[in-house]
């Protein structure tokens, strides 16, 4: 067999893409224009089930406070359509670089 992507990796990629798009939209609506949003996802998979997905976000957004950035990141996580479709715990850790 050849190496390939598994379904869990595709779910993680879909969540990261959706989350970044939603966060970019939320930031732009609040007049913050991100220079960079870099998000990784870590899936906890046990007994054939995705138990949780931890998003690790590093962003560069001029003129935003760290608290406001975390607030917007949580809003994006909660309102992202992919997050809403998944039946697992999703957390986000957001930091400015």
Residue ranges of model-derived segments:
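Extended beta-strand/beta-hairpin segments
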Residues: 1-13, 20-97
